[in-house]
UniProtKB/Swiss-Prot annotation:
Top-level lineage group: Archaea
Lineage: Archaea, Methanobacteriati, Methanobacteriota, Thermococci, Thermococcales
Keyword ATP-binding found: yes
Amino acids binding ATP: G28, P29, I30, N31, S32, G33, K34, T35
UniProt entry tagged with the keyword Transcription regulation: no
Protein name (Swiss-Prot/TrEMBL): Uncharacterized ATP-binding protein PH0541
Keywords on record: ATP-binding, Nucleotide-binding
Family the UniProt entry places it in: Belongs to the archaeal ATPase family.
Species assigned in the record: Pyrococcus horikoshii (strain ATCC 700860 / DSM 12428 / JCM 9974 / NBRC 100139 / OT-3)
InterPro entries recorded: AAA+_ATPase, Archaeal_ATPase_domain, ATPase_dom, MJ1010-like_2nd, P-loop_NTPase, WH-like_DNA-bd_sf
Length: 321
């Protein structure tokens, strides 16, 4: 469910009004609404754009064949590259491909072949007078996949070529993995070739407005925000628990505190009085808490903070005992 991200939508639409020049990484805390935002953005693009939304969460990706099958889908209507244009919609969940070309890509296990076909499709789209937009959601899923070296860095090099060098397509990579973003941010090869677009939880007043639109009362809305802040996933769930709203809020807090209590971490003590702390580098302790989705690391700001308001309250509950 999409609500009041107009400022972010306008920024994204403005970005694509210029010639492609960067790979844009869309990142933020878990369940902050990144996927919903990017899908709404694609819907709102004009007819001069063709979107591809590739979701690496929709199926396990443990090898090159599975990667290729997420990226491409066989379509019997395609005999030649130029046939692709006639079957594309405004937003497409994969890149259509002739069966024999897909078979060759799967057989050869050479990423360059997959990338070459994708480039040909994008060139055909540009020749038709339209601009492609490539979106890869949860790209970090393939970060450990090896195909003649690191697949993800081969993909990054290709995406940089598409955007910064060939100016063939706007490219977005979406992730909730802040350690992955930290690696990207610290990669010298991506310096000057990547931009970063943070998506945080909704501000509390906007969250209350959202809940009021879901027919919760002012009092009920403020209660939900008191526990969950502007975390969209909890805001959407709240109306289902309206009959026992406070009990639901307390139960979620208790469960989260129980999970956090397993971590004997002195680092968490810093959040007793602070909502965000600056860090020069991530300790092993911090990495474990980020991996457990308790803390969120923002490499652009150089800060650590709880993944959401519920985590902040749970941390303080654990500290107080």
């Amino acid at each position: 469910m999409f609500f009041d991200r107009e400022e972010e939508i306008e920024r994204l639409l403005e970005d694509i009004s210029y010639e492609p020049n960067m790979v844009t990484f869309v990142y933020g805390p878990i369940n902050s609404g990144k996927t919903t935002l990017i899908q709404e953005f694609l819907k709102r693009t004009s007819e001069k754009y063709v979107g591809f939304y590739i979701n690496f969460r929709k199926t396990p990706v443990a090898n090159y064949e599975e990667f290729s099958r997420v990226l491409f889908s066989f379509d019997s209507r395609i005999k030649m590259i130029k046939d692709v244009i006639s079957i594309l919609g405004k937003v497409n969940p994969w890149i259509p491909i002739p069966r024999e070309v897909l078979n060759d890509i799967l057989r050869d296990k050479e990423p360059i072949n997959a990338f070459s076909y994708l480039r040909e499709v994008l060139e055909e789209i540009r020749s038709s007078g339209k601009m492609p937009i490539l979106v890869f959601d949860e790209l970090q899923v393939i970060k450990d996949l090896k195909v003649n070296g690191s697949l993800i860095y081969q993909l990054f090099n290709f995406l940089i070529h598409l955007s910064k060098e060939a100016h063939l397509a706007h490219v977005f990579a979406v992730t909730s993995d802040s350690l992955f973003i930290s690696e990207i941010f610290g990669n010298a090869k991506l310096s000057g070739r990547a931009s970063y677009f943070p998506v945080y939880d909704l501000p509390e007043e906007k969250a209350i407005e959202f809940l009021l639109r879901l027919n919760l009362s002012e009092e009920e809305s403020r209660l939900v925000v008191e526990y969950f802040g502007g975390k969209p996933s909890y805001l959407v769930e709240a109306p289902k628990h309206r009959k026992h709203l406070r009990e639901w809020c307390e139960r979620e807090l208790t469960l989260r505190a129980r999970e956090i209590r397993r971590f004997k971490s002195n680092l968490l003590l810093e959040f007793m009085d602070e909502e965000e702390v600056e860090v020069e580098e991530l300790s092993e302790e911090a990495i474990n808490l980020v991996n457990a989705n308790i803390l969120f690391y923002d490499p652009l700001r150089g800060t650590l903070r709880p993944q959401g308001k519920l985590e902040l309250l749970a941390i303080r509950k654990v500290i107080k005992g």
